[in-house]
Amino acid sequence: MTVVEAIKMPNEHVFVPGGENSRSFRNALGAFTTGVTVVTATTPEGPIGMTVNSFASVSLDPPLVLWSPAKSSSRHPAFSEATHFAIHVLSADQDVLSARFTRNGRAFDDLDWEINDEGVPVIPGTLARFECRRAAAHDAGDHTIIVGEVLRAAHRDGDPLCFSGGAFGRFSRQ
């Protein structure tokens, strides 16, 4: 009996990530419920944004957060070079806003947004916002981990938009 066989639970799919198991690995990662954010920045061509669920707090002092865009994204170069960006945490009723930023295109058309002191587009009315200066960027496989020093933050009461198993949902308080 192998160690893996010894710790396997009934109805559990045990696998080694990679290759033919990439879908199983994605499904396992999808079991972890995340919040949903829209990250924005400015390029010479104008504002840019993308929907992201790879957001986390790093440090309270100094205030640091991180997110990690995929290198395969056509927007990766713009975000990995941006010196400033804003991370918007979406509320449970903002799934349509999330969808606007899942593809390249005209996400800012007919959208209420402003420019902050650093020239970054900010979207009012989100559940929380973190306006950041890039503190570091780290190569991490097929993604880049971007660490931001939070210059300003905003927050309002409300329920977050959640993402799990490939679907949006709401957080249910117990």
Swiss-Prot record:
Q: Which domain of life is it from?
A: Bacteria
Alphabetically sorted, this entry's keywords are: Flavoprotein, FMN, Monooxygenase, NAD, Oxidoreductase
> According to its UniProt record, which reaction does this protein catalyse?
FMNH2 + NAD(+) = FMN + NADH + 2 H(+)
What molecular functions are annotated in GO for this chain? FMN binding; monooxygenase activity; riboflavin reductase (NADPH) activity
Record carries keyword Flavoprotein: yes
EC number(s) per UniProt? 1.5.1.42
Induction entry: Induced during growth on sulfoquinovose.
Q: Which family does it belong to?
A: Belongs to the non-flavoprotein flavin reductase family.
Q: What does this protein do?
A: Part of the sulfoquinovose monooxygenase (sulfo-SMO) pathway, a D-sulfoquinovose degradation pathway that enables the complete utilization of all carbons within sulfoquinovose (SQ) with concomitant production of inorganic sulfite. Catalyzes the NADH-dependent reduction of FMN. FMNH(2) is then transferred to the sulfoquinovose monooxygenase SmoC.
Tell me the protein's name.
FMN reductase (NADH) SmoA
Gene name in the database record: smoA
